[in-house]
């Protein structure tokens, strides 16, 4: 049985937190303990939303689930926080893209099924990304979608040598390369001509960006 659900609405998508308030009402009606945490601060409305808003980091302890209200960007933002605590994320789509969301706004009533455990948790591969220079890690993070290496502001192609633990994979000359997880295969990688992977595939997609040649 769920002991605590965190409702995380994106205030730029859920104006006045209308959808989150309705979700809270539904969960309260089935006696599902819940708190509301806003992951993005809305500078235009700093005074609150008529709800008891709690600090997200403080409420993560003991949480059984995070419900994200927004688009894929909201889910991506929360996924890194959730992964460190092994907390599943349920997405309610309020954005223009909702590849990762399981529910649409019109399906909010189904949240009442959570206390009856009428749901399954699906594991998703994440990328552990590090930038190493001269043997020193200067950046490290988790990514649910993809990691991208590009030429940036340089107005010429770059040459990349891509290797795995087994050795050389391929060389790319072009604008860069995308390394996408199965979840990320429907995003930037797909737009760059990469294939779509099933979300449970144990592998990644390496997609060159505007390649001049593959060798």
Identify what each model region corresponds to.
Residues 1-65, 77, 105-122, 131-141:
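ATP/NTP phosphate-donor binding region
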Residues 7, 68, 179:
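Redox-cofactor binding/interface segments in oxidoreductases and associated redox assembly factors
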Residues 11-12, 72-74, 97, 183-185:
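Short glycine-rich anion-binding loops that position phosphate/pyrophosphate groups of nucleotides
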Residues 16, 73-78, 185-191:
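Short glycine/serine/threonine-rich phosphate/pyrophosphate-binding segments
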Residues 66, 89, 177-178:
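Short, well-ordered beta-strand core segments
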Residues 77, 81-95, 99:
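Gly/Ser-rich helix-loop-strand patches that form or flank binding pockets
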Residues 96-175:
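Catalytic core of DAGKc-family lipid kinases
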Residues 170-215:
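Gly/Ser/Thr-rich active-site loops/lids in small-molecule metabolic enzymes
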